[in-house]
């Protein structure tokens, strides 16, 4: 039980660590128009928003968050304006089918071709690159209890889709997003990959700290 509480605390800490820079960025960018020359990236959740901001540092990229604060991702219903914005974007990044079930409905409604890279797979639809950031990640199974009832709007199935709370999985997500960004904007691919390498190094250091802390809790 102690280890479970510790793991939950660490997961919450990582979530806050990833979200705080994004929250600060939102405040700084309030009222600023998008850069017409920069690549446009739409992300679904705060962790992906933070990944995208870190990966595009040093460029004129326009990173936006689709879900308003406080909105439940599982039950979110994109408006027609949201769908149009996604179609006009250069990159659309989401966590995966178990987290944003509605994302596949949007994607399936569009004509596209499958493109692959050495490090992952992404979908190209015209000029739009779609990044499923759960690719390459084995989701953890959730132990079902007979006395538990599924909550409305939380259609996880038997898997935990909150993959960004694990630093190693977060690093994989960042790598997938990097390849999508590089495909959409080859001119800045070198910058994206350099930023990704630095970001993944920070996550690896964080993971090492987690492992050391967990070892001490045994």
Could you describe each region identified by the protein language model?
Residues 2-13:
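Bacterial N-terminal signal peptides that target proteins for export
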Residues 12-14, 25-218:
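Extracytoplasmic metal-acquisition and chelation regions
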């Amino acid at each position: 039980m102690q280890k479970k509480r510790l793991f939950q605390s660490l997961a919450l800490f990582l979530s806050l660590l990833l979200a705080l820079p994004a929250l600060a960025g939102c405040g700084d960018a309030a009222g600023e128009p998008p850069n017409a020359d920069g690549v446009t990236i739409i992300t679904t959740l705060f962790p992906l928003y933070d990944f995208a901001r870190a990966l595009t540092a040093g460029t004129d990229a326009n990173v936006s968050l689709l879900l308003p604060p406080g909105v439940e991702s599982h039950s979110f219903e994109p408006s027609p304006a949201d769908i149009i914005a996604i179609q006009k974007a250069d990159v659309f990044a989401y966590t995966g089918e178990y987290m944003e079930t509605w994302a596949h409905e949007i994607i399936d409604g569009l004509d596209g071709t499958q493109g692959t890279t050495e490090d992952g797979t992404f979908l190209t639809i015209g000029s739009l690159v779609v990044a499923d950031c759960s690719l390459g990640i084995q989701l953890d199974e959730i132990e079902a209890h007979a006395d538990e009832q599924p909550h409305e709007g939380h259609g996880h199935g038997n898997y935990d889709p909150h993959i960004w709370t694990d630093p190693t999985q977060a690093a994989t997500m960042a790598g997938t997003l990097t390849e999508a960004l590089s495909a959409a904007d080859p001119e800045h691919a070198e910058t994206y990959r350099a930023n990704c390498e630095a970001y993944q190094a920070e996550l690896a250091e964080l993971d090492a700290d987690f492992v050391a802390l967990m070892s001490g809790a045994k």
